[in-house]
């Protein structure tokens, strides 16, 4: 009896959730200084509030760039296509499509890290800048490591499937 690719279902469901969150981020509007004016009135230091507003706007504009939109839409399409292949029990094509998604997700993590680094320079306080840089680096590293782990799982399972197929063919030849 052939094993079910539970690993791929789990990975694709997690990736579909992440893609849905990214698509929602594209739909949300870019904030303006006026819409974020309540930060200044919340008792926060005025300089920090202005820098935080500028940082938030810059990061959101970067997230709404054409390149990022293409990355997000392509990743969502790849997840849907991989799910369709999986439902149709074409595991090999689902694996290859998912590998394409993972490489695209790694590219997206790097692109977002570069965009945040540009926005971090808006903070004048070195402690705040360092905190924002650490958050950006941590987020990028987490995203890349997570995707590399997903990639390793898929490659390992593909290798095992190929090994089992080869062993089954050898047994047929001997019989």
Segments the model singles out, each with a brief description of its role:
Residues 1-12, 58-69, 88-98, 130-140, ...:
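Membrane-water interface of alpha-helical transmembrane segments
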Residues 1-36, 153-166, 173-175:
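Cytosolic juxtamembrane helix and N-cap/initiation of the first transmembrane helix
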Residues 78-112:
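Loop-to-transmembrane helix junctions at the membrane interface
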Residues 33-65, 111-141:
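Interfacial non-cytosolic loop connecting adjacent transmembrane helices
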Residues 66-89, 146-164:
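Transmembrane alpha-helical segments in integral membrane proteins
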Residues 17-33, 55-70, 100, 107, ...:
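Long amphipathic alpha-helices with heptad-repeat character
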Residues 17-24, 77-81, 104-110, 149-156:
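Alpha-helical transmembrane segments
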């Amino acid at each position: 009896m052939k094993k079910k690719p539970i690993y791929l279902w789990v990975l694709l469901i997690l990736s579909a959730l992440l893609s849905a969150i990214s698509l929602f981020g594209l739909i949300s509007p870019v904030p303006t200084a006026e819409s974020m004016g309540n930060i200044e009135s919340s008792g926060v230091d005025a300089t920090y509030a202005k820098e935080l507003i500028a940082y938030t706007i810059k990061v959101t504009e970067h997230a709404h760039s054409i390149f990022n939109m293409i990355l997000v839409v392509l990743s969502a399409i790849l997840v849907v296509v991989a799910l369709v292949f999986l439902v149709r029990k074409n595991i090999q094509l689902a694996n290859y499509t998912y590998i394409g998604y993972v490489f695209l997700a790694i590219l997206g993590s790097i692109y977002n890290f570069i965009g945040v680094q540009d926005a971090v320079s808006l903070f004048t306080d070195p402690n705040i800048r360092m905190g924002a840089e650490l958050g950006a680096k941590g987020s990028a590293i987490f995203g890349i490591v997570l995707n590399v782990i997903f990639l390793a799982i898929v490659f390992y399972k593909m290798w095992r499937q190929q090994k089992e197929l080869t062993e089954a063919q050898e047994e047929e030849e001997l019989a």
